[in-house]
Amino acid sequence: MVKTQRVVITPGEPAGIGPDLVVQLAQREWPVELVVCADTTLLTDRAAMLGLPLTLRPYSPNSPAQPQTTGTLTLLPVALRESVTAGQLAIENGHYVVETLARACDGCLNGEFAALITGPVHKGVINDAGIPFTGHTEFFEERSQAKKVVMMLATEELRVALATTHLPLRDIADAITPALLHEVIAILHHDLRTKFGIAEPRILVCGLNPHAGEGGHMGTEEIDTIIPVLDELRAQGMKLNGPLPADTLFQPKYLDNADAVLAMYHDQGLPVLKYQGFGRGVNITLGLPFIRTSVDHGTALELAGRGEADVGSFITALNLAIKMIVNTQ
């Protein structure tokens, strides 16, 4: 890296394992400054519960960023709405969680931070607090006024992007339009080049239907929509292979010659990735005007404050964000 960068971290649901994981992140050195957007007492109390050392340094945006030293974090304070008991949700803290996301997002947009790494949130408690919330991806898309974003999950061996995200199965076929596919593939291709440093991305594209439609006998979306779009984009120079049946695509003879897979819907691509690398996966939002990565697991309320949470996914998310920062410099 040319100079030390700042990355901002949101721990997520305060009653879950997010604060535990952030405290665990602090137990090693990092080449970037870790700015945690969270409540002061929440972090110090959780560190005490875990028996881990933690010194919180005030965020000073006008000072040069410094690499993070062991046992320290830089704190950008946001106050809890209610006091927290590990493992017990408090509805009012749904507002607190959204405040941390908004502050972190705005900091990325105004250039304070080079990347954003998010911990797990509890969507139910945020909605119970009266805040419509589908997920991080949609929240950052709206707040950043991005034209379109794409969800991609990745392990060291596999990257899977989604054409659609949190839609009921009955709505997916109607959502797969030529315009959507053009946009999603363009974003995926662009970010693989600019954020992952892949000069000529090779993308495998799943069909929508079983056997990729079996020549139109099991659905016509491949013939009517997917194939024409892929043909157009191939003519522009993109390296696209598909549409391929999803039940046979995820094997070495295809994956060894690909940089990413585009699945048509959430449960088509992600079960394979999570089986292959659960606990090591990272959620990446493509198409944003900043770098955003996230853990690939939930809040695990039952583990909060017990010292049993696995920090592996958070470490992977942070390391990937650092690599993406380097690629974009």
Curated annotation (Swiss-Prot):
Substrate binds at residues 136-137, 274, 283, 292. Its cofactor is Zn(2+); Mg(2+); Co(2+). One of its GO terms (cellular component) is cytoplasm. Pathway: Cofactor biosynthesis; pyridoxine 5'-phosphate biosynthesis; pyridoxine 5'-phosphate from D-erythrose 4-phosphate: step 4/5. Its main location: cytoplasm. Gene3D superfamilies: Isopropylmalate Dehydrogenase. One of its GO terms (molecular function) is zinc ion binding. One of its GO terms (biological process) is pyridoxine biosynthetic process. Keywords: Cobalt, Cytoplasm, Magnesium, Metal-binding, NAD, NADP, Oxidoreductase, Pyridoxine biosynthesis, Zinc. It catalyses: 4-(phosphooxy)-L-threonine + NAD(+) = 3-amino-2-oxopropyl phosphate + CO2 + NADH. Pfam families: PdxA. It is an enzyme of class 1 (oxidoreductase). Binds 1 divalent metal cation per subunit. Can use ions such as Zn(2+), Mg(2+) or Co(2+). It is found in: Cytoplasm. The keyword Signal does not apply. SUPFAM superfamilies: Isocitrate/Isopropylmalate dehydrogenase-like. A divalent metal cation binds at residues 166, 211, 266. Its EC number is 1.1.1.262. The active site is located at the dimer interface. Catalyzes the NAD(P)-dependent oxidation of 4-(phosphooxy)-L-threonine (HTP) into 2-amino-3-oxo-4-(phosphooxy)butyric acid which spontaneously decarboxylates to form 3-amino-2-oxopropyl phosphate (AHAP). Belongs to the PdxA family. Homodimer. This is 4-hydroxythreonine-4-phosphate dehydrogenase.
